Amino acid sequence: MRTHIDDSASGKNHHLPMLWFFDSSLRLCAIPLSVATMWITVTNKEDNSSYGMLKYNNLSALKYMVLVSALCACYALLAAACSLVRCFVSKAWIFFVSDQIVAYLAITSVAAVMEMYYLAYNGAKEDSWSEACSSYGSFCSKVKLALILHTITFCCFFVIAVISAFRAFSVFDPPFVNSQEVQGD
């Protein structure tokens, strides 16, 4: 049983309104970033007289990024709305798990598009793949912009996931170690 009451425990709730504001702001910032990523990617196409038309739906990594961006935007909107409802705010574990899932999905799509962009920009000479960005420069530039926006979206969700982890685990007290037990060893 604890005999010492931590004075910082009463100050623990002092930062919650600021944390809620930061969390909500990040969620709301992720929405236009995700929508912009989708719009840039879906409208991206370029025609080359030698190789033909290249569209986003020719590349599975870009289709995956559009899908994850749509999921990020919808989830961010839903989570921001749910954070205003008091019964959902008390369910920190729901936000923790769902924020983790969305952050992981976002990083997987960033990695997939980054790999695709690297191959398009540099090629893979050992596999006899030539680089494609010299032929499709505008397409590659828009993919790069979409990748940057999606990476910023991931960063938002990473910070959101850290905040939700803090909320979920801050309700537990740290383990108590009796000083006599430590000295006795």
Swiss-Prot record:
Please list every transmembrane segment annotated in the UniProt record, as residue ranges.
16-36, 65-85, 93-113, 146-166
- Which coarse location class applies to the principal site listed for this UniProt protein? membrane
- Parts of the chain on the Cytoplasmic side: 1-15, 86-92, 167-185
One GO term of the cellular component aspect? plasma membrane
| Subcellular localization | Cell membrane
- Pfam families in the record: CASP_dom
Membrane topology annotation: Multi-pass membrane protein
Instruction: Quote the InterPro entries the UniProt record gives.
Output: CASP/CASPL, CASP_dom
Q: Provide the membrane-side ranges marked Extracellular in the record.
A: 37-64, 114-145
* Quaternary state and interactors: Homodimer and heterodimers.
Q: What is this protein called?
A: CASP-like protein 2D1
